[in-house]
Amino acid sequence: MSKISLTQVQKMKQSGEKIAMITAYDATFARLFDDEGVHSILVGDSLGMVVQGHNDTLPVTVNDMVYHTANVARGVQNALLIADLPFMSYSDVHSACINAGRLMAAGAKMVKIEGGDWLCDTVKQLNRNGIPVCAHLGLTPQSVHLFGGFRIQGRDAQRAEEIYHHALALQTAGVQMVVLECVPEQLAERITKALRIPVIGIGAGAQTDGQVLVMQDALGVTTGYIPKFSKNFLAETGDVRKAIQLYVEQVANGQFPAAEHTFN
């Protein structure tokens, strides 16, 4: 696989080619995922839960994200590397630019932020500083306490319209990609069709431009609560490399996510 740039990912949307994204937190897994054809690797603040053992992502710091982004970057040759800005690290435009700059210096090619149209000025300023932005809408884990837990978003008409509006506003502001988490498939399809930029789903059905999974979910090593939208690809293959190959293949041909991984 040749090097995947943001331009190439956007062309994949235009051509209908599905985008396979997965999280990674170290160089070894990043290299393996890169070798097996994953298009994009996300250094997620999910590391707070799956690496550090917290109950949510809120304790993750910018220093944590810089450390893991640098580790992952050393293992990536081709995939588009995206890194999360953690909780409260982009609460104002100045902080967002400083902290995003640190992630880019560590090797990220794009940063991801959680939230809606109130972030438009932040997105514009990040773009002015040469930093591409991915927006995260729907179930945004940094707002878990505001939502009253990890709950599906957009099932009622008002909330669905809000999410749709935020997606359009953020695209206008300059966002180059959107992650939609835990929203009904019908809403995800509507947003995907409305946007020019790639829409990556996690628990958002099969009509998005691509899928992302936490690596521990994809490899079946998550303990405790197992999200409905996850699938254990290792169980079908018995080999980590083959599991990732199967994930990329099933995203590409539309087999994943299936109906049992989808919310309506």
Curated annotation (Swiss-Prot):
Location of the protein in the cell: Cytoplasm
According to the UniProt record, what class of enzyme is this? transferase
Q: Which InterPro entries match?
A: Pantoate_hydroxy_MeTrfase, Pyrv/PenolPyrv_kinase-like_dom, Pyrv_kinase-like_dom_sf
Q: Gene3D superfamilies under this entry?
A: Phosphoenolpyruvate-binding domains
Documented EC number(s):
2.1.2.11
In the record's cofactor note, how is the cofactor described as bound? Binds 1 Mg(2+) ion per subunit.
Similarity comment text for this entry: Belongs to the PanB family.
| UniProt name for this protein | 3-methyl-2-oxobutanoate hydroxymethyltransferase
Q: Which species expresses this protein natively?
A: Tolumonas auensis (strain DSM 9187 / NBRC 110442 / TA 4)
Q: Per UniProt, what is the name of the gene that codes for the protein in this document?
A: panB
